[in-house]
Curated annotation (Swiss-Prot):
Interacts with the cytoplasmic NapA precursor. InterPro entries: Chaperone_NapD_NO3_reduct (IPR005623). PANTHER family: CHAPERONE NAPD. It is found in: Cytoplasm. GO terms for cellular component: cytoplasm. GO terms for molecular function: signal sequence binding. The lineage of its organism: Bacteria, Pseudomonadati, Pseudomonadota, Alphaproteobacteria, Rhodobacterales. Belongs to the NapD family. It comes from Paracoccus pantotrophus. This is Chaperone NapD. Its main location: cytoplasm. Keywords: Chaperone, Cytoplasm. Chaperone for NapA, the catalytic subunit of the periplasmic nitrate reductase. It binds directly and specifically to the twin-arginine signal peptide of NapA, preventing premature interaction with the Tat translocase and premature export.
Amino acid sequence: MREPDRTPIQRRDILTGKLKQDSGGESRFLHISSAIVTARPDRAADLARHFATLPGTEVHAVQGAKIVLVLEGASVGEIRQPHGAISVMEGVFSANLVFEQILPADEREALS
């Protein structure tokens, strides 16, 4: 196993979603965010099934009009893309990110 790259993260890299990559072109980080989606109660179950098909998106709970999601990606941009798509879907009233964590990519295996 190779030694992980521990180069410090720059604030600008986080804000722009351009965290440095390793020499193989893969992101050195795993971004994990949770979101609460509020939807029409009569559409929540169908929307949750659809959200589960989106890359990097897991549905953790559906209760009434509320849907709890976890979004994972190699960058902030990879999280923003499905979040943006979800927020404008018919039947969705709001989609709010409520948590974000950035982990070194070498910790992915520990989460699996």
